[in-house]
Structures are given as C-alpha cells and as structure tokens.
Amino acid sequence: MYREITAVEHDRFVSESNQTNLLQSSNWPKVKDNWGSQLLGFFDGETQIASASILIKSLPLGFSMLYIPRGPIMDYSNLDIVTKVLKDLKAFGKKQRALFIKCDPLIYLKMVNAKDFENSPDEKEGLIAIDHLQRAGADWTGRTTDLAHTIQPRFQANLYANQFGLDKMSKKTRQAIRTSKNKGVDIQFGSHELLEDFAELMKKTEDRKGINLRGIDYYQKLLDTYPNNSYITMASLDVAKRLEKIEKECQIAQSERIKSLELNREKKVKQHQDTIDRLNKEIDFLKEAQKAYDRDIVPLAATLTLEFGNTSENIYAGMDDYFKSYSAPIYTWFETAQRAFERGNIWQNMGGIENDLSGGLYHFKSKFEPIIEEFIGEFNIPVNRLLYKASNHVYALRKKRNS
C-alpha cells in the first residue's frame, strides 16, 4: 500500500535511514522545478517501509517518465519489501501514464580508499540489492564505465568526519594549503552576499573548461531552498595588502643582501638574491592584477554546499585560473569540508569522479584522501511494457548525444 505523505513525514523517514542524502530531501524538487514531483510513502499495514521523492517528466502524447534520484529509501536486503515497493511504484506509474521509472539507489558496490580500490571485493549489501531489484522486476543498466552514461555519477569521492584531517593528507596537499595561507589567501563563509562573486567564478570555470553550467539565478535558488542548510566558501586575496607586505619583504631582503656582500658571504648573497627575484616576480604579477581587476580584494575560488540530515554535498565549485599559483582551490575545498564537519555532518560528498579513476575530477579530489564510492547504478522499472523498450532506447540515444 502506498499514499502521498507530507514533507515532514518523508524527511523524517529519510533522515532516520542509513541512506540519507540531499537528492531525496523533500526540498530537492523545488530546485528541479521543470519537473513535477510527488512524495510517496509505502506501508505494510500502519508501518512505513519505504519512502520516495519522485520527479515526474512530461513526455509527448501525455506520457511521462519518473525518476527517483538516490532512492527509493528502503531495506534492499528484504526481498519482500523490495517486491512490494516496486509493485506499488508500477501502480503509481500507471496513474501517471509513465513509460518507465528510473532509480539509482544510494547503495554501494565499493567503499574504499583509492589505493585499495582495484583489489577490494564488492560489498555484499550492493550485490544483494542488485539481485533483489532484478528479481522484483527492475532492469539493471549494469556497471557503466563512463561518467556521462548515468544521470547521477556512479562513482564519487566522499570525505568522512572520522577520517578527515590535515595530518591524513599527503605532504604535497599540506604544502599547497600552507602556500595558500602564506600568500595571504583569506577564507570566508557566507550566503547571498557572496553570490555575485561566486557566479563570476563559475563563469570563469565555464569559459576555461568550455562547458555550460548554471547562472546566478540558479545558485540563488539553491540558497533560497535550503536557507539554513547551505553556505558558500570563498577564498579571496587582498591584492593591495599582499603587495604592500611583499614590497617590504623585498626591501628587507635587499638590505640583507648588501650586508652579506660586505661580509663576503657568497652563499647568503645568492639566497637573498633568489628571495629578491621571487618577490619581484610576485610584485610584478600583483601590479598587473591590480590593473586587470580594478579592485583590491579579488575572489580566487569558491564552493557552494548544501546539507540534509547529517550529510553535506559540495554542489558547485569555481576558480580563477589567473591566480592558480596561490593554490586557492585546494585550500577552499579543505575549509569547505572542515566547515561541514564543524556543523555536525558525518560526511561531505565532493561529487562525481571518472569511473576509471582517472582524469581531472579524480586527480583533484584524490588530493584529499577521500573514500571512493561506487554505487550499484541505475535501474529501470518498466510500466508500459509495450512502449518501454522503444522509449528506453530513445532515452539512451538522447543521453549519449547530450553527454
């Protein structure tokens, strides 16, 4: 038996489960307002056994497609529950004239650090879930090999509070964070007051990567939808302050070099000259930056984080590549996670990575020593058997063309 439930009922069930995630929060459909939505509870008598926030996409000729991101929330180890829920979902799908229902449960096939990933066995829970979903009538799309083949990433990099810390990271990552601090990069946390700078950094990221992301209206919608469970982390540089500081350092180095010359200390002379050259290089860079940006405080990197239950998601991140030598993105992402854990979250998802654990996303996120999580992937629940295969084939072609 199933029925429509309130947002409070749904969020309570999801938050009390071991599958808590942002995409199954009752507020997420407000972000995806180009889809319809429904909150359904599934019951055995008076006992709720599952919950689903369902997105509904209208299709031509009055048909629809249903999508349950990172859900439904239920005990996948219980075949009876899985069978009942899928039966009820099909019944609901028929009322919506759905061709099929797509879901990608928050169940893992692997959860392990990167160095042990290849040789680690599959999680028993994941294998059981795949088996039960298939036995209940769902079609599994398999262990897809490309990030673009699924709606949600099948692989992600996740940081856990009980395993997170600067001491857990490589010497190179620690050095990058230290460099950023030493160069005067400042971190602040905020919300709407940082939106314009955040959107500008995202636009720079779009231009650099040649991709289309979102605009300021969408980022504002995220903050508005999760007003008490969102924050922007912004790294910035006070260019004038930094310039003044290193000009003074350069003067000191020049004085020390003269003293060393007088004392005939050749090694010290060279050390001071190297320092002077390094500082002059940065002085020239900052003077050019002042001309180019026409502002003293310049945003370097930023992230936008949303929370639900005791979980946190780093949803969007941007940077200004002009200041890449200041290592601001690494510092920003570190502080973003640190903030998440200070706010009581048990994990902070850094988002999807390439399925073969290579490429830019993986290379950057692996610097933080995350847990690599492989999901069981997508499942299709056929509703209209007559049209399901043809419509799913068309969907797959469109997905491939748009990836």
Language-model-detected regions and their locations in the chain:
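Conserved acetyl-CoA-binding loop-helix of GNAT-fold acetyltransferases
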Residues: 79-90, 325-337
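A short, internal acetyl-CoA/4′-phosphopantetheine-binding micro-motif in the GNAT/acyltransferase core
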Residues: 71-78, 162, 317-326, 354
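Catalytic phosphate/metal-binding cores of nucleic-acid and nucleotide-processing enzymes, i.e., regions
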Residues: 67-69
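Active-site/acyl-donor-binding loops of N-acyltransferases
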Residues: 4, 17, 115, 119-164, ...
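Conserved GNAT acetyl-CoA-binding A-motif
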Residues: 93-115, 341-352
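Short, charge-rich binding segments
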Residues: 83, 90-96, 131-132, 146-150, ...
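Generic hydrophobic alpha-helical scaffold/packing signal
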Residues: 220-223, 303, 337, 362, ...
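A conserved beta-strand-loop-helix scaffold within acyl/acetyltransferase catalytic domains
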Residues: 2-45, 49-62, 108-110, 126, ...
